Design a protein with these regions (language model features):
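Bacterial N-terminal signal peptides
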Residues: 4-16
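Beta-strand-rich interaction surfaces with strong enrichment in secreted/lumenal proteins
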Residues: 43-44, 121-123, 174-176
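Generic short beta-strand segments
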Residues: 31-35, 58, 135-139, 188-192
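An acidic-aromatic
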Residues: 46-104, 111, 122-163, 169, ...
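Non-transmembrane domains of secretory- and envelope-associated proteins
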Residues: 20-26, 35-37, 81, 126-131, ...
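Short secondary-structure junctions
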Residues: 117-122, 246-247
Length: 263
């Protein structure tokens, strides 16, 4: 069975599992529309539950499902056609704040996360907004590194980041807009690469949902939530069916999982 292509598409969705690691996350479901030049529009479905997130995506008639359980720090990739699944640990990089609100004011954003430690360095002004400055250290084998994150004290989103490779990110609040009937804040994110190259991403943050519901990236990439339905999500959406068989993750992220080839 071939997991890799569809798995990469799910990872490209504008939702980080960080969204479900925060305090008081609202449960809801939504459709995500994605479009980019010279490619067919893509539609996926997302479900946000109690500390868990599920994403369904169909490409060329093949559906894949990803379930992330942040309480257990575990991610599952399901192949309904083959009735099989892969399982892995949800790494620190997946639960760092990014486009989603995190812990309550002054709370340690790394609390409960394996191989990730945070040290509070104080409060600084970032584009006119008070932000907590945190040092985050990843101690995972082969992935050690340190980054500095400034968390907006009101929204609990990262408004500035300094990454180990020298890249930086900075957010600036543009204003407030109504999008699909929901009150949002429009933010402009500027990313600077180590060589000095810059690009800008526009994001529409929904304070009630504590996450972005629209994003526009360079090159014409647009992603937007629609048909948002707030409410308790069924627990069985976030469990692996008992008749599914576990297969191994391919070495080096190869195209095939397990030993049986493509189903």
């Amino acid at each position: 069975m071939r997991f890799t292509i569809l798995f990469s598409l799910i990872l490209s969705l504008p939702v980080s599992p960080a969204v479900i690691a925060g305090q008081g996350q609202i449960e809801f479901s939504a459709v995500i529309d994605q479009s980019m030049p010279q490619q067919e529009p893509r539609e996926s479905k997302i479900y946000i539950g109690d500390g868990r997130m599920r994403t369904d995506i169909t490409v060329n008639g093949k559906t894949m499902i990803q379930i992330v359980d942040m309480k257990q720090q575990t991610a599952y990739m399901l192949d309904p056609a083959g009735q099989s699944y892969m399982v892995r640990k949800a790494g620190p990089g997946e639960v760092m704040p990014g486009g989603a609100s995190v812990a309550a004011k002054d709370a340690n954003p790394c609390a409960g996360m394996q191989n990730l430690g945070c040290t509070r360095l104080g409060v600084e002004d970032v584009n006119g907004r008070p932000a907590e400055k945190w040092e985050m250290v990843n101690t995972s084998p082969g992935q050690s590194g340190k980054m500095i994150v400034w968390l907006d004290q009101e929204r609990r989103i990262p408004v500035r980041q300094s990454l180990p490779d020298g890249s930086t990110m900075e957010m600036h609040l543009i204003g407030r807009e109504t999008l699909n009937g929901r009150d949002t804040e429009k933010w402009e994110m500027t990313v600077t690469r180590p060589g000095g190259q810059k690009y800008v991403v526009e994001q529409w943050f929904d304070p009630a949902l504590k996450m972005n519901i629209r994003e526009e990236r360079p090159g014409g990439f647009v992603s937007e939530f629609r048909n948002i339905k707030v409410g308790k999500q069924p627990a069985d959406l976030f469990t692996v069916p008992s008749d599914y068989k576990e297969v191994s993750i391919p070495q080096g992220g190869g195209a095939e999982a397990g030993q049986g080839g493509e189903h």
